[in-house]
Amino acid sequence: MSNNKQTAAPAATSNEKAENGAEKEAIEKFVEVVRNTPELQGEMFFDGCIIAMTKDAFKGKYRVFYGNGLHTSIMFGAGTAALDLMTPGSFLPPFPQRLIKSREGSAPTMEATDPMMSRVIILMNGECLDVNSELINRPKTMGDDAISNLTDDLNNITPKEGEATVKEWDSLPGGELRYLSKANKPDETYMKDLIEKYFEKAICHNGKKVEDYVFFLVANPIAMVSLARKGFMSNVNMHNYESFENNIVIPADDDELYFGDHTFKVAVNNERLNTSSVANCNAYVRPFFHGCNGFYQGRNKRIYPESHDLYRRDYIKDYNTDYKSLCYSRKTENVMPVCDFISSTAATLVLQKFPLNYVIEHKFTTEDDDYKTKMAMSVKLDLIKEIAIKNRYRPNVFDDNFHVSQDRIYATKYQGHLERNTISPNALHTYKTGGKLGIAGELMEGEKMSQWVHTDIASKFTSMENFNKNGGDEAALCDDEEKELGFGKMYVTSRLSSVFDFKSIFNANRMTTQHELSSQLGDTDTKKEQKEKRSKQGGSKLFNYKIKSAFNPVFNSLKSPAQKILFNMCGDRTLFKSVMEDALFLLRDEIFLEDKLVMTHPAFAESENPNHCQYCKCSFNNGMAGVENKDFCFCYLILRTMCALSAREPTQFNITNLWDKTAFPSELPPTTTETFDYNFNMNVRTIERKNKCSAYGNAVLTDSERENGFADPNLKEENGSKKKLQSYMKEVKLEALIKAVLTAEPTLLHPDQRINMDKITEGDEFYHKLEANRFAKSMGYKQDFTMGSIGPDETPNGSYQLSSIKSIRDVLLKDSKSSVDYELNKFIVVPGKMTHTIKGTKKSDDGDSKTDGSGDMEDDFTSLAKMTNRKRKAGGKDGPSKKKKKDGADKSLEKLARAMLLDLLEISIPNSDASLSLEEQNQEIRKFWREKQIHPDYIFLFPNAEEKRKLTPETTKQLCQKFMKVVGICRDMIRPEPTSSENIRLKLVTTYMAGVRDYIKRLAEFLAKKLNYSSVEEMRGYAMSSIRMKNESVKKTQSSWMDPQSTSDPVQKMMERKITSAYATHRIESANTKVLPYTDSKLIPVCSEIPIPARMILCSVGETESDGCKRLGYNIEGYKRNEKDIKMAGEKQQPHSYLTPLEMKIKMDTFQKEAENIEKEKYVDGNKPETAAREEIFKQVREKEINCGVYIPWEIMAKDLCENAGYKDSDVLDPAVLAHILKRADVKFEKLGNGGFASALNCKTIAKLLAGYLDTMEDVNVTRPSLITNIFSDMDTICSMVNKIGMNMKSFFGSYDYATFDMATFNLKDTLLKMISQEPELGSVLHLLITMATIYGVNTSTNGKLFYKSYERDSQAAVVGIGGILNIFLGMDACKSSNAAREIKQAQRKINPMITTHMDYNMKRGGGIDRWSTLDTAKCQGMSRYLGCYSFSTYPGQQGSNDIYTKLKLSGGFFYNSIPAHICAQSKSHNTNKVTMCLKNSGVLYSSFKRGGRNVDIAELLNRGDLDDINNTILSTNGLAQKIAAYFLSSIGIEPKTNGFPDMGNMSKSMFVRKIVKIHFSEFAEEDGEIMVERKVLKHILGFVYPDDSVVEKPDMFMVYDPSAMDVDEDEDEDMDDESDDESDGEEMSGE
């Protein structure tokens, strides 16, 4: 894609050719769209303008969304905003053109000019844009005044005594910030004069006032520089440089700004604005011109001479007439005045757009420090104007007044050329269009536009629209403003991570090179000498230049973290405010600590007032209980946010620790170049679909013993094709093999326990929604409720999710006593199917034991009672009647009870889409009982009841059978220990492990077939001896784009511009290129040209209207009519060559580093003399034949085998040890599932080994393979669902049978050990898998906290399975080299995956963001972002080539000691894994956000039943707890009091809790549920009800019984509970 010639470039691969072809096609389509859309181009005759637009235009539907998504920030009615939001529309085209005067008698030419800057300056009445202040509750200490005071303190910084002189200080980056104005908005006098002179007559009509309009300033880069310079140089002649040391006055260009002669009126057609409801929506524009804009100075009477062929055209004649209206004159009265606010804001915007991260050594001297600072700022701005904007170098000016190295000047020219000439094709989607794809939306169709990154605003809008469409009840419950706010801040976590991480390149205010540092430290070696020195030392022939964040005394003089952040934002107070609001949004309701502790400021812990922040001049954290107006300072907010991002508890220890690491990131300047290894943390954007390389790079497998490798040995030579096929199959690329496995075997889940989210059936979707909507909050569920896969290269990997509900129903729908399937009618009428199919799992040859349900009712009931009281025999064969039915439809008690249980299952888990609520379903049940004249307690009372005569014998029998069996099964679900094979948890775990076993077997069979082995057994033999992986490391390369135009986030823009600056600096350093007078676009690498011809689309001016303004527009129709004539007349339309976004490569090493305790080994000619003993051991193992025929267990960590294999004192397993183990243990994958894999004799041994391993699962200091962690998490999730259902059933039947039956705590270990005793093979499979995962898996203990669990589990299963079955490791083939001696580490080699998750996944809470499929509507699914540490590396081209290439390289310390490291929840030891985390733009993202300070509907809040939501709302809303307390008291008939406590009489706290739970939280009406309600909600309420709220009593044990629904009095309810308990005991006795 580079334009420079490469004489020895390698031949392009087929993939590269395809990509280049796709890119060329995309460029052609982009140019075609621009050519066919005249509104995208137009004459931009001015350099800036001041616009007045009615406030009504900003009251559109998506006002909140655009205000946040485009990062509008206002203080005191003034600030900055995105041009995309503020532009009137087509008046400011994205591809502006300007007429250029030609020689006398010739027509002017049309050429491209700079567009307006992407940020505008809001001057007045911008309060209507400040949506965050309306929605995000801020304490006074975080208000606009506090931010203003913080900025004033930054302006007052001065160099310390002895640290630097004023001259040196001003030469440093940021030294000029102390001269920024303290003004928060323009002077009232300035705005009053401006409005009276240019706008008042136009806007004040038809009842309109000045207060009804927003005033803002728009300017192109050169005009913005002039605005900034004029404020700093107010006392200096703007036309000249002042006399310096040599007393020479050097003339400069006219840098003045002049207002035009007219105020124009333009139509507002920006689709983001509320133009539809505003009649005749217009904006009033006063243009201004830069002094160098000579064409519009009014010197020409006609721009087209009469002799020109086009003069006779009406189109041109009209423009000749309008020309004078467009001009300006250099009169004194037309000079544009500039106030301090405009100048300072313009300076910050310019410095953000063109960062100067290096020292500028001034040569002028003066005694006036204030004047010197002004000149220093002026020089920096002039440097930007001349080099970055105009791309010209004036040695006679620059060299005489200040010194900048030639390398830096070239880098600035390089960066400026990219900034001004790069065009983002996808930026069209957000310019003067609505949130939808808009005017160039067709560009996103298909795959053609996947070459470049899409805009974040389009991604956010698409996500929000999809949430509205597919979000269901959650979307309906969210009000529009909350929804828009959530999506507008969709990337808040990555943004804050960049700002608060002081190792981020965003915070690199000064960068230096290794060569510069060497010069500063007195190293006189030249670059050439340094290269030669490194070459002699055996290093790279090319000197590896690096970029480092250098010491900056200005930055380090700041102690407050808030000031440091403000400093790195170039003093932009409005941008700082928006970041602080992002932090408040991220924390939401968790700003204050739950225990209300007052924390001490880490910097002032030893002071007299440790809670007072001397930086922010307020309390550090005033979060005490009882303090009504809680507040905190900026330091606390920043540290509290860092705790949230790093998943740390906000304790005093953690906050102090973070302070020590971040408040003073670099106290001392560097003193040596030997440790010049600083890596920047960057947040770069990539496109996943464009990156063809997988995480496994170019690693290949080979079989050294087979002549043709993996080719089919039976392949016959036909037409010379044998050689080609043999060559292709000689080696197999690991990437292709893993992809094939992920496609053929996408998941290890059992078919009865999984749901395919890509091809979800109606029934599976029903189960999925039940589980997601009912249990996600109440269980703290960690499952991924995501519709659609996110696997790489469109494999189905990641699309299969575990379904607990489906798993449990599968167990209940199987009948171990029947050998045939049958259907059973449901007992209770609820939504869904009316019958259930019961699958008979009994072996057909055991048919004698089948039971008939037609025996004597008395005997059946007696048998059932025995089972209920745990005295029955397993299998339920006690009944005396064992008759058979010919049709096989067994009507035994087991089947009836299962049907009843299925009914109860749906009762306890109501469908969110069902027509009946939980209460309504319960009412339906009671209605059924009444219709049948059955008393609900009749089952227990009928021996003595008169109502027995009302029932038929059949009805009585069925009711008894169903109810008693349900009681038994419920008890089995919640009993403490797995006592029998009928235990539901045991069945679920057994089914899960059976799925794992079958997966490994299918995987082995697939690999054997794929690699052309005749059998799994044959493949196993070669795996033990000859299958190896070639390549010492596995690399992955990703493509990334630096495309600031495609993001509206100022932080992301600044970051990408600094990356580009560092890239340019590194390139010139490494290439040692001389500075060119004019930057040649061919020197810009990895950019393609986009030729866009200039179109003759001229302005048109209408007649003066009643408001005194002329209508300004574009003569598009005239241009279309005369386009042919313009071409025939020879009009020059030379295309301007724009550049595609700068593409960079990111190289990632996905091999895990070696452990430090493994010594280096010498390999000479492929031999290993010092490990001959170890090789002899393995040779003996391979030759030894084991004939036991079954699986032999071993110690999981295999320490004894490690020592025997030559690994002394090592806990590390590697593939060589696994080869030893698999051979010794006689692992035969082909025997899995056939009954011959494992022996029951080894059960105790395996159980003991696994028990020891399971005991380590609770140890947080022990790292475990991610695959094993996820498998255990899955099993625990399913069994926890059993507990939850058991609790619901206990609540349903509690009054009758469960008053004394306690809920058990599930123990996965006990269940697994029980499974091993019954299924020895499954225990062996788990044992084997743990060892394989220890070797080939990733030791990242995320526990589903951040990563996409389904994807991580199944992708790891594929890698672990392939590695273990083929026993792949770096064999001798990888160690052979042309070098006589080669040093290599032969230790464990783990293939680490690309961990993919979604952007802004709730890293703080470990889940909770719902996502829906966007594959049908979103066009940017391939978008990704990377958070990681990068360093620049350089390498030469092929031999004979002079080309030098540069890449970004992912460093070994991925996420090391940075905030992203804590986000990833990896310890220091884990960082060596170099796990690459790909943060995908979420298809749908919404985090519930409750605005502070608004009225809360208490009834609506309580009806949601979300305890976490209620808790957070109480914490975030002042006075709400007391209001809810009054609400609760009124609901139980007690009058609340405004002051003091209510009269509670004899009602204890436990009784109060019971009543409140019964009335308002009936779904939590069981013991555990009550405790949960009390802990999360009532703890805030009891303090307003009872005086002593220090200790809250634990509520008494009780069961919920609804007397009103059963038509029973409350007094009878108490008696009934007692009778039920007594009669239940009686039944147990009778059962015996």
From Swiss-Prot:
Region entry Disordered, spans: 1-23, 516-538, 838-890, 1603-1632
Stretches assigned to the Cytoplasmic side: 1-63
Keywords, ordered alphabetically: Glycoprotein, Host membrane, Membrane, Transmembrane, Transmembrane helix
Basic and acidic residues composition bias: residue spans: 842-853, 875-890
Acidic residues composition-biased segments: 1607-1632
Ranges that cross the membrane: 64-86
Cellular localisation: Host membrane
Membrane topology category: Single-pass membrane protein
GO CC terms of this entry: host cell membrane; membrane
Glycosylation sites (chain numbering): 149, 274, 654, 719, 797, 1012, 1031, 1261, 1339, 1511, 1546
Feature: compositional bias, Polar residues: 1-15
Extracellular topology ranges: 87-1632
Name the record gives this protein: Uncharacterized protein ORF22
